């Protein structure tokens, strides 16, 4: 346990920041889940719209130092890759000409 007054204050600050970080991380994860849910329901346009909001939250989380910037970039990349995969599956494929 902390002995000095400043150390006790530091514990309070750390607890407050931990809570703020968890809230920010929860918002980010929820946004990602909403995008995935839209994809599973087959609504590609809604998923793309939700992706922009999720990407913004991911960037904010990285800017606040809750997650590393490379982690944020990886999350956005994987999410966009998933959207493109579902978009390719749902769009009709052009027929190739047999030679």
Curated annotation (Swiss-Prot):
One of its GO terms (biological process) is translation. GO terms for cellular component: cytosol; small ribosomal subunit. Keywords: Ribonucleoprotein, Ribosomal protein, RNA-binding, rRNA-binding. The keyword Transferase does not apply. Pfam families: Ribosomal_S20p. One of its GO terms (molecular function) is small ribosomal subunit rRNA binding. InterPro entries: Ribosomal_bS20, Ribosomal_bS20_sf. The keyword RNA-binding applies. Binds directly to 16S ribosomal RNA. NCBIfam families: S20. Belongs to the bacterial ribosomal protein bS20 family. This is Small ribosomal subunit protein bS20. The lineage of its organism: Bacteria, Bacillati, Bacillota, Bacillota incertae sedis, Caldicellulosiruptorales.
């Amino acid at each position: 346990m902390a002995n000095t007054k400043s150390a006790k204050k530091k514990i309070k600050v750390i607890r407050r920041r931990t809570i703020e970080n968890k809230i920010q991380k929860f918002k980010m994860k929820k946004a990602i889940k909403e995008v995935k849910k839209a994809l599973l329901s087959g609504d590609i346009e809604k998923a793309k719209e939700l992706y922009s909001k999720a990407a913004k939250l991911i960037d904010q989380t990285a800017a606040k130092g809750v997650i590393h910037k490379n982690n944020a970039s990886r999350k956005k990349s994987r999410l966009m890759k998933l959207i493109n995969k579902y978009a390719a599956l749902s769009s009709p494929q052009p027929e190739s000409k047999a030679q």
